[in-house]
């Protein structure tokens, strides 16, 4: 039996050569995965679409068909005019080539400012889509994203100006990751997501960053089993709550990863999760001031509202027996022994 081929093309290849390689492929040796990474230029997009359409027609059992769409300017150099221009290009392209997008399973977009209905229209066109990643994409400042899709399994959002993301009806959605939301209310509103199992939230907290209450955020998804929170070595933005409030939403939780807590922060507050999550099997805590990624200039920190390191107050109670069976990982570049001592003191071990 012939071995299925995995094909990856980048913008460094001339597209005439790309088309030639795809068209010359023996149909009896199927392509299973086709990943194409390219820049959003009108002529290139059309050439890519034609080449990929022929590959889809020839190799009808493509397990993965992915577009990773770049823009000519990186996010930090994009003005609003750039974002609007790139989104207009993309909308023209998808309108000209709906058949190709209907066959995609994975799509990663960057640096696009859409209209209100554009992203829902993209989801409607991409009928097979299983994974969507939006990096510095939105529908304008304070826009609200409404997401519905029958096949989507994974949603990943990096930054952008969404005021809220409503996950309305996603029957197959399993994984959600949201990095760097812009506003103070809960960044995600969960509707019908019956298979959601993994949630990852990453945020650089400043003085104005509101605390998230897990009892409210997860009220409609009490079946989540894997929760990952990354604090980027800055303010703790999760509010410790009484176990009686949290137990109904954390009862199915098996894995918790608390990443990049600021050094010097007392980790006793993390015990509220242990007290509420009766099915927890693994708790991983990383305490680290990541100087390569943190803002270190004192004046800039003051101007942007970064806060001084402050402990989160939490009065620990009596720890139930199931905590003793939870595997706990503690990681810190310089204070691992202190972390273990703190945790043992907290648990009374």
Where are these regions (language model features)?
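Short loop/turn segments at connectors of secondary-structure elements within structured domains
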Residues: 28-30, 266-267, 279, 340
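Short, solvent-exposed loop/turn at the beta-strand->alpha-helix junction
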Residues: 14, 41-48, 72-78, 90-92, ...
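Conserved hydrophobic beta-strand positions in leucine-rich repeat
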Residues: 2, 32-39, 63-68, 81, ...
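Loop/turn-rich, solvent-exposed surfaces of beta-rich toroidal or solenoidal domains
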Residues: 258-292
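A structural signal for leucine-rich repeat
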Residues: 49-56, 76-103, 120-128, 143-153, ...
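Acidic, proline/serine/threonine- and glycine-rich low-complexity intrinsically disordered segments
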Residues: 2-12, 317-320, 326, 331-348
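LRR flanking "cap" motifs
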Residues: 19-31, 245, 319-329
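Leucine-rich repeat
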Residues: 1-148, 158
């Amino acid at each position: 039996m012939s071995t299925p081929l995995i094909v990856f093309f980048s913008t460094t290849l001339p597209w005439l050569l790309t088309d030639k390689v795809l068209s010359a492929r023996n149909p009896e040796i199927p392509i299973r995965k086709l990943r194409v990474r390219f820049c959003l230029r009108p002529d290139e997009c059309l050439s890519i679409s034609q080449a990929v359409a022929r590959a889809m027609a020839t190799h009808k059992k493509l397990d993965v068909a992915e577009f990773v769409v770049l823009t000519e300017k990186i996010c930090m150099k994009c003005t609003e005019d750039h974002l609007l221009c790139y989104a207009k290009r993309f909308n023209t392209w998808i309108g000209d080539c709906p058949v190709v997008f209907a066959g995609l399973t994975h799509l990663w977009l960057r640096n696009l400012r859409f209209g209100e209905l554009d992203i829902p229209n993209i989801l409607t066109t991409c009928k097979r889509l299983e994974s969507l990643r939006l990096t510095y994409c939105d529908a304008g400042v304070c826009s609200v994203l409404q997401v519905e899709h029958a096949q989507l399994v994974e949603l990943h959002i990096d930054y952008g100006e969404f005021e809220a993301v409503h996950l309305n009806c996603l029957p197959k959605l399993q994984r959600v990751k949201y990095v760097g939301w812009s506003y103070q209310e809960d960044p995600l509103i969960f509707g019908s997501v019956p298979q959601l199992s993994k949630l990852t939230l990453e945020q650089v907290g400043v003085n104005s960053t509101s605390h998230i209450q897990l009892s409210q955020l997860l009220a409609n998804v009490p079946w989540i089993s894997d929760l990952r929170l990354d604090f980027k070595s800055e303010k703790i933005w999760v509010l410790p709550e009484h176990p009686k409030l949290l137990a109904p939403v954390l009862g199915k939780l098996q894995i918790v990863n608390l990443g990049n807590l600021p050094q010097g922060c007392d980790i006793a507050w993390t015990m509220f999760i242990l007290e509420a999550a009766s099915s927890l099997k693994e708790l991983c805590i990383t305490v680290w001031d990541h100087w390569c990624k943190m803002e270190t200039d004192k004046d800039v920190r003051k101007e942007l509202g970064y806060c001084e390191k402050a402990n989160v107050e939490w009065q620990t109670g009596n720890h139930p027996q199931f905590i003793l069976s939870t595997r706990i990982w503690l990681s810190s570049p310089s204070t691992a022994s202190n972390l273990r001592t703190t945790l043992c003191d907290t648990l009374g071990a």
